[in-house]
Amino acid sequence: MYKGDCLQVMDYLISKNIKVDAIITDPPYAITNFSWDQIIPFNEMWDKLLKLIKDDGAIVLFGNEPFSSNLRRSNEKLYRYDWKWLKTQVTGFQNAKFQPLRCYEDIMVFSKVGAVSSCKKPMCYYPQGLVNINLKVMRSSVDY
């Protein structure tokens, strides 16, 4: 596990010809005027991520709208699915007079391999720590 500026850490790992199973990062969303909160150019980011990730690895990125939609569109070919992180503390108090507080964050998963059983070599997924919420899951009443 590495902690640091992701572009610098990725450059270091690439220079050592290291390939990794997973990349989990929380890039800046450009939702404030702080100097550190500037979107990393997507082309540069994807170039580095793809040099580092193993062919069957997962790239997991955090975000909020509208950044999340832009991030998904930046690499639709490798986008697989989202998780929603329900936070224990809401955020966005500085904008509370203008919009609802945010209680969740998007977690977007990208991979070079597919995420469905019909793929030649689908991504591995081993759920852990699942909590039974006792809800009946019903099928949609509309057939597509």
Predicted regions and their residues:
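Core catalytic lobe of class I
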Residues: 1-144
